[in-house]
Amino acid sequence: MANIRVFTFNMRTDAACDGRNAFSAERSAYIEKEFPKYEADVIGFQETRPEMRQWVIDHFPAYTVCGIGREADLQGESNIIAYRTDRFDLVSLDTFWLSDTPQRPGSRFATDQSSCPRICTVVTLRCKENGRLFRHYNTHLDHVGAFAQAQGISLILNRMVSDYQTWQMPVILTGDFNVTPESKVYATVNGFDGCGDALVDVSADVGFTFHAYQPEKTQEKIDYIFTNIPADPTKSMKATDNEDGIYLSDHYPVGAIVSLD
């Protein structure tokens, strides 16, 4: 049995308005210093701009980084997936847009969506320890439109069903969903059984994840790890590190340990 430590990590785009917490100010160095102690095997990132993607490649050489930007020119923010090269082989990689034309770069839903295109990055990985395959879907749902959120997650789940009919392998879904556990989107995903065993929110016990650099005031649970791979939710975790007001992000990275046999 291979235990795999999976994380979802909204890295927060580089924004000067964050002051010392801007990625290009003090935060990137803090991530490099603190995040490795969590020994993540697979990480689904959100809000990684091209320079941040390159930073991950340069500063975390033990990982292979996959994914493209969400804009029409394949630049802009991405939902990259990083996996430990010594533990996994890449079998397949894809990106699709959350829109009525998911293969058209930069596309988005025509109504009730922000100006931001939204994407889902998908990798199939083979575990070197036991040869088992699994698929990892990583996304960032819209932060404005409830319709776009609902349509986006429906598109992802339909894709998972289609993929399962071809691949018949277990799945992991990570991301910043921009909705709370009381939402219809959450209810749609948690317990979804269209791709084999039902999806379970193995991050359910970690508490709030979005804090906007002020956790004493802002507390929202919007970051999730769903999977149908066996896992113990009580062993899930979130990275609450901060040092003199510097955080890993305005979201807490969230992790879970799944057991692939």
PLM region descriptions:
Residues 42-133:
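Structured beta-strand-rich core segments of catalytic domains in phosphoester-bond hydrolases
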Residues 3-18, 91-96, 122, 132-142:
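Active-site-proximal beta-strand elements of phosphoester/diester hydrolases
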Residues 8-27, 98-115, 145:
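Acidic/histidine-rich helix-loop elements
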Residues 1-59, 70-77, 260-261:
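N-terminal, active-site-proximal structural segment of metallo-dependent hydrolase catalytic domains
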Residues 6, 10, 31, 82, ...:
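Generic structural signal for small/hydrophobic residues in well-ordered secondary structure
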Residues 4, 41-42, 134, 170-172, ...:
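Short, Asp-centered acidic motifs that coordinate Mg2+ and/or phosphate
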